[in-house]
């Protein structure tokens, strides 16, 4: 068998991203001024010479499907290979939906068997990193592994968020614990990057599908089972930058890392291009008297006010006297004259009225609807929300998608919630 094939798991809900993923799949969330999160994984594939890719979608797939399309930005619009969007095809039973990451691959076994690949790469579509998968393939073959898991070392206080692997000196995995409470098992976290021998993967998936007690998930079921019975599972230590942006705080921090003088990844590297789907936009316009400091400003933006340590996506307008500070502002949003944003994340097509203040005060009361996700001082505003002139919005507030100006009856206190209608994408 020849060739290479990759599955990208892109159907997760991403509830910890709050409003940003309520109406779109997590891999479709915008990132870094012009990209979407899945662009990193797709670009890693083509930059590594993998041009046959299946993207498994399920939750709110519309934005993701529209973004990927036929794969032209990634040179994946091909007669042979290319990109295929693989959605579940449910019948009358709800069990036809993908029940877990392993089940998602199992339901596409026929698709896999048609591929002439000796190994199968299975990737998460919601992480920020740049990896040459050729190095992973070489490690896998050198160790005669059946499964190789890419791992990275995480801080001790974050081990409970990841699957943690224990290894021997040669990388052979001797133990695996899914989201342990302590770092007793070490700090080597699974990156959600798996390289399987094709035939072994097929056999293991069929075996797992027959187990009624299994949740059919790679991290919860398959990987622990394979390690426990001594299969040739190896861990490849990835030395580069890798970020799981699955929470509002991690998403916010990762975006702002890219405005620093030395960002964690070189997004302008001609040897490792980060491809994406982009619309034609005019150049950035910076008016006389405007001030832009340490920020990413995408095409089509017009800045007449002040932008500090922020990320502006295409088409954002910052009027005279407006201040955008430590914030992420998505496509075609208007920040009107005299308005101020501080530690805020605004989704697409938001309108912030004159003199409004979004993210203000010292009160750090956690959000009353999602305190576990919104407690560090960030304000999140949903797509197409309309914030009226002069409104004051406290820290940790959540303003829903498509909220109208008349939906606000008073200032929004710290931790406050203003909900909008459903059905926005």
PLM regions and their residue ranges:
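Left-handed beta-helix
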Residues: 1-5, 199, 206-425
């Amino acid at each position: 068998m020849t060739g290479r094939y990759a599955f990208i798991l892109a159907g997760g809900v991403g509830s910890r991203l709050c409003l940003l993923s309520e109406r779109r799949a997590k891999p479709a969330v915008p990132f870094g001024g012009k990209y979407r999160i899945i662009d990193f994984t797709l670009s890693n594939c083509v930059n590594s010479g993998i041009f046959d890719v299946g993207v498994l979608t399920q939750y709110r797939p519309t934005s993701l499907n529209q973004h990927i399309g036929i794969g032209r930005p990634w040179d994946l619009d091909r007669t042979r290979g290319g990109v295929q969007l693989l959605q579940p095809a449910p019948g009358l039973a709800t069990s036809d939906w993908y029940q877990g990451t392993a089940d998602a691959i199992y339901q596409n076994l026929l698709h896999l068997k048609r591929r002439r690949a000796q190994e199968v790469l299975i990737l998460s579509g919601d992480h920020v990193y740049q990896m040459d998968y050729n190095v992973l393939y070489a490690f896998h073959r050198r160790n005669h592994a059946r499964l190789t898991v890419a791992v990275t070392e995480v801080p001790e206080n974050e081990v409970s968020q990841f699957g943690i692997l224990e290894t021997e000196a040669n990388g052979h995995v001797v133990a695996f614990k899914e989201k342990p409470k302590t770092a007793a098992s070490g700090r080597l976290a699974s990156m959600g990057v798996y390289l399987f021998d094709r035939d072994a993967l097929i056999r293991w998936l069929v075996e797992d599908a027959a187990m009624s007690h299994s949740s059919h998930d790679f991290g919860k079921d398959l990987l622990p089972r394979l390690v426990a019975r001594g299969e040739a599972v190896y861990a490849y230590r990835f030395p580069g930058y890798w970020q799981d942006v699955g929470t509002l705080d991690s998403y916010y921090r990762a975006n702002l890392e890219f405005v620093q003088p030395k960002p964690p990844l070189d997004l302008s590297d001609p040897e490792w291009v980060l491809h994406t789907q982009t619309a034609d936009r005019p150049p950035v316009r910076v008016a006389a008297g405007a001030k832009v400091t340490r920020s990413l400003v995408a095409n089509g933006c017009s800045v007449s006010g002040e932008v500090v340590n922020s990320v502006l996506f295409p088409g954002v307008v910052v009027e005279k006297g407006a201040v955008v500070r430590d914030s992420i502002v998505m496509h075609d949003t208007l920040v009107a004259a005299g308005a101020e944003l501080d530690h805020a994340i605004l989704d697409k097509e938001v309108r912030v009225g004159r003199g409004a203040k979004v993210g203000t005060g010292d009160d750090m009361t956690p959000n009353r609807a999602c305190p576990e996700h919104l407690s560090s001082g960030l304000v999140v505003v949903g797509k197409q929300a309309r914030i009226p002139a002069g409104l004051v919005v406290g820290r940790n507030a959540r303003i829903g998608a498509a909220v109208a100006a008349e939906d606000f009856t008073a200032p929004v206190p710290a931790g406050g919630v203003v909900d909008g209608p459903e059905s926005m994408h």
